[in-house]
Amino acid sequence: ATQHPQVDYNGLLYSSVPYASAPSQAVNFVASHDGYTVIDKLRLSVKGDHADDELPPIDKLIHTILLTAQGVPFIRAGEEMMQDKQGEPNSFRSPDAVNRIDWALKAKNRDLFDYVRGLIALRKAHPAFRIPTAEGLQQGLHFLDTGDSGVIAYTLGEYANGDAWKEILVAY
């Protein structure tokens, strides 16, 4: 979203330049009230005999990326407990049974709920995950060469944004 010397903006489909001048101008989200929930999207894309078993770890990865990325994270209410909208892509005219938060899911999916709560606490405790300026991001965030592994990894270093930790390694 902001200028970084290690990012090649020529490969982007929507723009050849960054669209934000500061990380705080980028709102990061996977789902909102306007479409499918995260779990609905996953159910549409993850197929096979063990798909239901694969959804929670994928959901954890999604939340890990969202809450460790620079910018402002946005989490739709209920995502932290695998709330769905019964596959409804636009629930504007749907009944409360589709749109309400099913609080029983908090107990059923407690592992994910606690995991997301822990990620929020990590983000709040470490200002390196909330670098406010493009200059701070350019100085503190360094991508690692992971080749063709499919892994994205970077460090937040030198006490980025006044963090108590000298260096943080983030890898997905």
Task: Enumerate the predicted regions with their spans.
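Conserved, charged catalytic cores of large soluble enzymes
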Residues: D96
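Conserved alpha/beta catalytic core and glycan-binding cleft of carbohydrate-active enzymes
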Residues: A1-A77, M81-D84, N90-F92, T133-A134, ...
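Catalytic cores of eukaryotic secretory-pathway lumenal/extracellular enzymes that build
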Residues: N99-D102
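Catalytic cores of secreted or luminal carbohydrate-active enzymes
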Residues: K106-L137
